[in-house]
From Swiss-Prot:
GO CC annotations on file: cytosol
Originating organism: Escherichia coli O17:K52:H18 (strain UMN026 / ExPEC)
A Gene Ontology BP annotation from the UniProt entry: regulation of DNA-templated transcription
Reaction catalysis annotation: cytidine(967) in 16S rRNA + S-adenosyl-L-methionine = 5-methylcytidine(967) in 16S rRNA + S-adenosyl-L-homocysteine + H(+)
Enzyme Commission number(s) of this protein: 2.1.1.176
Protein name stated in the entry: Ribosomal RNA small subunit methyltransferase B
NCBIfam families: PRK10901.1, PRK14902.1, rsmB
Coiled-coil parts of chain: none
Described function: Specifically methylates the cytosine at position 967 (m5C967) of 16S rRNA.
Keywords associated with the record: Cytoplasm, Methyltransferase, RNA-binding, rRNA processing, S-adenosyl-L-methionine, Transferase
Pfam family, one: Methyltr_RsmB-F
Organism phylogeny: Bacteria, Pseudomonadati, Pseudomonadota, Gammaproteobacteria, Enterobacterales
Gene Ontology terms, MF aspect: RNA binding; rRNA (cytosine-C5-)-methyltransferase activity
InterPro entries for the chain: MeTrfase_RsmB-F_NOP2_cat, MeTrfase_RsmB-F_NOP2_dom, NusB-like_sf, NusB_RsmB_TIM44, RCMT, rRNA_ssu_MeTfrase_B, rRNA_ssu_MeTfrase_B_ent, RsmB-like_ferredoxin
């Protein structure tokens, strides 16, 4: 039996690690969830994701409610108060229970002397909630995005930035990819229906299913047997452009965690696939996905800027480059991105993408296809990146995705209920 732990203090410490230390929630949360009971796993996730989604609002409220900020060793208390405010604002947890558990969190973080302070701040919010929220909603903080990102979105999308921001602040739907080597989408949907769940097929992507209500993977029919994989609809769109064929040599570059690697093999089971990623730790997830789906690929650790180190002079029929990016298209799925990224990261990422594109292009066969993809919505990483590449690369030709002046296809967050995603299809003359 799991030891009873204070979930509010655990959430506060996790959020603090993201905001103050720049750690990714996807690395922090799973080990924490192993320490709590199954019924508490979902609440811990809700508290962490929710606080990060609404962080700027909670921070704004604390600055109004407290004379001076908590600093030094007491900084965790700042995040504990955030957890308390989030519960009062956004959950169905009875206010008395939210207050009691949050105040007790002070004991768990060894700050019992601050229980009175935490209780006082949260009760003050309850008394002043209406006036405070009215003032907040009239401020720029109401968009729940850092100012640098808001400015970039406003510049890139003067007519659409508000809808992008709104989509980023929503809870994401759960999309699945049916493994066509096991089941047709319709036959798997019938199994889902028998299991008491409902799913909806995507209009354009033949393997994509949206669950009516997100569910743990272990309850999905045949998940452990590889019948279905969790993957957003926009990410599944890569295969429509890549169009892999049996017998081809295909490179999946920046492949971890392996969702697109396995999708290639579902579409073309006899393709010779090489999956490469710079992060050796994340490559373990590629192996896990291949094993669960019963598939084989050559998996290598390597830097996309130096392909000769891991593939020599080899050339490929098709290359999928899912480039390292700001991930500004998947904020609704990973709200910590808003607080992990900095404005200065964007030109650095654009430079890295440019170097990888230039380095990998010679490894594409004449007549071959390269799909450049990101989960970003920023032009510097997307259309401007491809426009510059086409201008300096004489044997590269844009195909089916946009125009030379506005290259690529940009999906915005929430469009057709998918994530923000960019694709450009390039052919080597």
């Amino acid at each position: 039996m799991k030891k009873q732990r204070n979930l509010r203090s655990m959430a506060a410490q996790a959020v603090e690690q993201v905001v103050e230390q720049g750690q990714s929630l996807s690395n922090i949360l799973p080990p924490l969830q192993q320490k709590v009971s199954d019924k508490d796993k979902a609440l811990l996730q809700e508290l962490c994701f929710g606080v990060l989604r609404t962080l700027s609002q909670l921070d704004w409220l604390i600055n109004k409610l407290m004379a001076r900020p908590m600093t030094g060793k007491q900084r965790t208390v700042h995040y504990l108060i955030m957890v308390g405010l989030y519960q009062l604002l956004y959950t169905r947890i009875p206010p008395h229970a939210a207050l009691a558990e949050t105040v007790e969190g002070a004991v768990a973080i060894k700050r019992p002397q601050l229980k009175g302070l935490i209780n006082g701040v949260l009760r003050q919010f309850q008394r002043q909630q209406e006036e405070l929220l009215a003032e907040f909603n009239a401020s720029d903080a109401c968009y729940l995005h850092p100012s640098w990102l808001l400015k970039r979105l406003q510049k890139a999308y003067p007519e659409q930035w508000q809808s992008i921001v709104e989509a980023n602040n929503q809870r994401p739907p759960m999309w699945l990819r049916v493994n066509r080597t096991h089941h047709s989408r319709d036959s798997w949907l019938a199994l889902l229906d028998e299991a008491g769940m409902k799913g909806f097929p995507h209009a354009d992507y033949p393997d994509a299913v949206r669950l009516e209500t997100p569910a743990p993977v272990h309850v999905l029919p045949g998940f452990e047997e590889g019948w279905v994989t969790v993957q957003d609809a926009s990410a599944q769109g890569c295969m429509a452009w890549l169009a892999p064929q049996n017998g081809e040599h295909i490179l999946d570059l920046c492949a971890a965690p392996g969702g697109k690697t396995t999708h290639i093999l579902e579409v073309a089971p006899e393709a010779q696939v090489v999956a490469v990623d710079i992060d050796e730790q994340r490559l373990s997830r590629v192996y896990d996905n291949l094993k669960r789906l019963g598939m084989k690929a050559t998996v290598k650790q390597g830097d996309g800027r130096y392909p000769s180190q891991w593939c020599g002079e080899q050339q490929f029929d098709r290359i999928l480059l899912d480039a390292p990016c700001s991930a500004t298209g998947v904020i609704r799925r990973h709200p910590d991105i808003k607080w992990l990224r900095r404005d200065r990261d964007i030109p650095e990422l654009a430079q890295l993408q440019s170097e990888i594109l230039d380095a990998i292009w010679p490894h594409l066969k004449s007549g071959g296809t390269l799909i450049y993809a990101t989960c970003s919505v920023l032009p510097e990483e997307n259309s401007l990146q491809i426009k510059a590449f086409l201008q300096r690369t004489a044997d590269a030709e844009l195909c089916e995705t946009g125009t030379p002046e506005q290259p690529g296809k940009q999906n915005l967050p929430g469009a057709e209920e998918g994530d923000g995603f960019f694709y450009a299809k390039l052919i080597k003359k």
